[in-house]
């Protein structure tokens, strides 16, 4: 299977059905396919070929999806570029990826202009007009590029074509994780059709007929990826899964989460699936639902069937609050990373929610440092290993590839760095990233466990926990906390609140209050920035 080939077959059978919505823009599957084919022709005309890297430096929108699809069509490799990156970060990623083309929003053009002279491999610059100044010499307007090229004829493609997604760089410099296109496409096809109540097709040739039948029955996935498409959660769960099942991807216009915009769109487009990133997204949605009810204009969320989250903690309390307001929901909490998928938990009304406890994928294991498999109920801590569709490796980094992607007992695994125990029932109890573990007074403390406890204290809105060098303890547990508007929790109250839930040594030694806890656009914790807040406050 191959993303582009599957989507072409879908466009052939439901061409008049909607594929993409962004504000007033609506693209049918035929239009989506044609615009992507024009973009593919532009890439080829500029001298790009199979395996050429194409940077996507954009916010969510139809152009992101079209430019990506166009890259897949000509067997290129679209590369996600974080729209928060400033000059040096942008240069690093485009240089590291060997990018030959860059599609970018004009509001980001000033950054592009300052680095483009240091990127000699770039052959094509395409600027998407979003009201920015447009300052990049040699850049071509996106719509003019499409108009200036006939659609590229369809071609055959290989399942071992490379799909690549760059990591967020939370534990070092961003790295390109390379997968086989066939395995990636097949995995997401398997995930999508069961959401329609259909058995997953065993072969690509079955997809078009299944999609056509579902569309004729009015059975389609209508998705909002609330997370950025430049991250795996947004593009994999929020876009690839619905599109591979012939669905609709509806993107938000605001560039930071506006829960009211999201809920208005759920109502207007009869959205069935929502992709978020844990509590950071779920809490504002809950507040917006409550405010709308209080104002006498509740949102119609009756179409919404599933909320999917991945990437950060989604606590049991917040899941329960969401189900109290939208009772028909299925909440799917996935554990994974750019390097692999490891497990999930499913919560519905009447099924007790949990935090950081997941059913393992059949190919997931937990291994100790000496490569022994952790047994259920043993209490041992090990590193989570994801089997199944394992990446080729990291682009241009064989040493890190050898450390992360290893063979144990004849099976190849990915070790993204997550520590876990295995419960008596075989489920994973996720403890957190090994690189974030705090060693205080000889005890290992997992930040996520403390963060969850802090967030239960009255008045706390958000929290990250870091270790700060300390003469007495080695590292002092330090909570970086933001409060709800109007709340007045004190350091002592927060420390006491945690001690009422966890062993005393896990409680913060210090609490640093900030107006906003630092997180990436996808809701993931920015521990580097949080640690700097803590250092600045305790200097």
Predicted regions and their residues:
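AMP-binding/adenylate-forming catalytic core of the ANL superfamily
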Residues: 85, 91-92, 100-104, 387, ...
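Structural core segment of the AMP-binding/adenylate-forming
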Residues: 45-46, 76-144
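Conserved AMP-binding/adenylate-forming core of the ANL superfamily
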Residues: 18-61, 69, 86-91
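Conserved AMP-binding/adenylation subdomain of ANL enzymes
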Residues: 185-226, 230-275, 288, 292
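Gly/Ser/Thr-rich phosphate-binding loop
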Residues: 169, 245, 271-276, 286-354, ...
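AMP-binding/adenylate-forming catalytic domain of the ANL superfamily
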Residues: 128, 503-525
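Conserved beta-loop-beta connector loops within the AMP-binding
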Residues: 365-385, 424-425, 487-491, 525-526
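Conserved pre-ATP/AMP-binding loop-to-beta segment of ANL
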Residues: 148-168, 172-173, 178, 212-222
